[in-house]
A protein has these predicted regions:
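N-terminal core-binding DNA-recognition domain of tyrosine recombinases/integrases
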Residues: 52-66, 76-159, 176-179
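Flexible interdomain linker/hinge and immediately adjacent N-terminus
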Residues: 138-175, 233-235, 276-283
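Conserved tyrosine-mediated DNA breakage-rejoining catalytic core shared by Y-recombinases
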Residues: 205-253, 257-261
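C-terminal catalytic core of tyrosine-transesterase DNA break-rejoin enzymes
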Residues: 191, 321-344
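Active-site/catalytic core of tyrosine-dependent DNA strand-transfer enzymes
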Residues: 245-312
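Basic, Lys/Arg- and aromatic-enriched nucleic-acid-binding interface segment
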Residues: 168-200, 204, 252
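Basic/aromatic DNA-contact patch characteristic of tyrosine site-specific recombinases
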Residues: 1-91, 99-102
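Catalytic-site neighborhood detector that most strongly recognizes the C-terminal catalytic loop/helix
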Residues: 341-366
Length: 369
């Protein structure tokens, strides 16, 4: 079993499979290229062809870029596995998919066994790719459902949660940043992400104003008492209110205003790249990977969990640490935290609360024991 193969390796392997009618490179990079087209009975025209392109753009926008990239990798891995077994991924075969899931879980190849959540995500990616090609994958088919149920029963483990970044931690992290342009930007990212309980993709997709760019994931309105972020999030459009802090050193809105002022940004992406010397803001929007790297770098520099080896410290913290930190630190009614994080249920919010009082309601005593 092969895992996380490079693009070049995929292309060379695809080229080697001359007997296969399946062009993996095209399928991987354009998974929905044939999903939308003119009916065979309709003659093409310039107007209709343009509408097909427009419809394809909307179809791609149905999922986030990160999700699409993950689904593309899922399909590439499954397609290569099929070729290695002398099979074709098209049309869908529940029997082959059941064997594939078993291979992922057993770790019988050179790569280690995958977690249940990763296997479940792989299956979702494969099903999505089949749907884009006009096929339906029945996940309830016994060859798939029973194998997956057995994998979950045998290998399921409690989810490994990332460490929450608490208020004292975020202050120590921003204290490691310089006061050049790049430092102002990164300080704003950390404070805004923490106070808003934002996902890293939500942070970098923000624009200054509504409809500034085609790829916008939302915009910011700065007011006297704080800022309102309108986000096109996983659960749909939502508003996040971020109030001003108790001091300029810790205020996310002040940090944002400082960054926008000195970077001379009044239109387009809020968080952009800077020149090598950190003195000039460029036009290119930051990647969400920058947020993850920023968190890990500042965690190390600030000495958080210094008693642990560096490798363990890096593994403990991620973009989700900001969201978990807000949920764990904010001493307010749970429903306000739930709204801020955009959770559909209070139970999901509680999963983010790393230090909540689990025994505030003691049913043992309430039952008379």
């Amino acid at each position: 079993m092969l895992h996380d193969m490079s693009e070049n390796h995929e292309k060379s392997s695809s080229g080697a499979a001359n007997g296969s009618s399946f062009n993996e490179d095209n399928e991987r990079n354009h998974p929905d290229s044939e999903a939308l087209s003119l009916p065979s009975s309709v003659a093409g025209s310039g107007t209709l062809d343009r509408l097909v392109d427009t419809a394809r753009d909307y179809a791609r926008a149905a999922a986030s870029d990160n999700t699409l990239r993950a689904y593309a990798k899922d399909w590439a891995h499954f397609a290569r596995w099929c070729r290695m077994k002398g099979a074709d991924p098209l049309p869908p075969s529940p029997e082959m998919i059941g064997l594939y899931l078993a291979d992922l879980a057993s770790g019988s190849g050179p790569s280690p066994a995958l977690s249940v959540s990763t296997i479940d995500r792989r299956l979702s990616g494969i099903a999505w790719n089949y749907a884009q090609r006009g096929f339906t994958l029945d996940r309830k088919n016994r060859h798939i459902a029973t194998v997956l149920a057995g994998i979950k029963r045998k290998h399921a483990r409690p989810p490994v949660q990332k460490e929450a970044i608490l208020a004292k931690d975020i202050l120590a992290m921003v204290a490691t940043l310089p006061y050049d342009l790049r430092g102002l930007r990164d300080r704003s990212i950390l404070l805004l992400g923490y106070a808003g309980g934002l996902r890293r993709s939500e942070i970098v997709s923000l624009d200054v104003g509504k409809d500034d760019t085609p790829g916008s994931g939302g915009w910011i309105e700065i007011l006297d008492d704080g800022a309102v972020l309108t986000l096109n999030a996983k659960t749909g459009w939502r508003e996040v209110e971020i109030g001003r802090g108790s001091s300029e050193q810790t205020c996310p809105i002040h940090a944002l205003e400082q960054w926008l002022h000195f970077a001379k940004i009044d239109f387009g992406p809020v968080f952009v790249r800077t020149s090598r010397d950190g003195k000039k803001a460029l036009e290119a929007r930051l990647s969400d990977k920058h947020v993850a790297r920023l968190i890990k770098t500042t965690v190390l520099k600030s000495g958080i969990r210094a008693e642990l080896p560096e490798k363990d410290r890096l593994a403990l913290f991620s973009g989700h640490s900001l969201r978990a930190g807000l949920a764990s630190s904010a001493e307010v009614d749970e429903r306000y935290v739930q709204k801020q994080l955009g959770h559909a249920s209070a139970e999901m919010t509680r999963r983010y609360q790393r230090r909540r009082d689990r025994f505030r309601v003691n049913l043992t005593k309430a039952a008379g024991l």
